[in-house]
């Protein structure tokens, strides 16, 4: 399900409205972008609809393959619902990460959750960034406020 990319510059997990638009924006800027989604059947249609930008995108059905496809140190943008889904994702992805890797929570999380998550990363050698994304689908595709 992957394009012919060996190593992505960044990963975007979550191909809903905002995640898919951000992935296309990054690809349009020349970045090699690995993408994945909880429902893997969203990946192939996304790549098909990407048109010529698909050459900068690689789709991955499993979290393990997704993480492995990103150049180290990894930067992974999660565009998933805030709260419990993000906590569960952190638990799932942490064993797959290496020192120096960065997780970016692009959901609009409560700042208390962001502080708690960042504190949990202290001393792990991995990094957590809470980054809200504003501008809706058009902003995400053409120039979001982050």
Regions flagged by a language model, labelled:
Residues 2-68, 72-74, 100, 129, ...:
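NAD(P)+-binding Rossmann beta1-loop-alpha1 motif at the extreme N-terminus of oxidoreductases
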């Amino acid at each position: 399900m992957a394009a012919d990319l060996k190593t992505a510059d960044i990963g975007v997990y979550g191909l809903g409205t905002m995640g898919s638009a951000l992935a296309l924006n990054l690809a349009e800027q020349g970045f090699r972008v690995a993408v994945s989604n909880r429902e893997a059947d969203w990946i192939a249609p996304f790549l098909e609809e990407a048109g010529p930008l698909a050459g900068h995108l690689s789709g991955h059905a499993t979290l393990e393959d997704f993480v492995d496809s990103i150049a180290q140190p990894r930067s992974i943008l999660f565009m998933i619902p805030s709260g419990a889904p993000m906590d569960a994702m952190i638990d799932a992805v942490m064993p797959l990460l290496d020192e120096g890797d960065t997780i970016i929570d692009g959901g609009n999380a409560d700042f208390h959750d962001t502080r708690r998550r960042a504190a949990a990363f202290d001393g792990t050698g991995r990094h957590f960034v809470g980054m809200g994304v504003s501008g809706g689908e058009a902003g995400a595709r053409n120039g979001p406020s982050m």
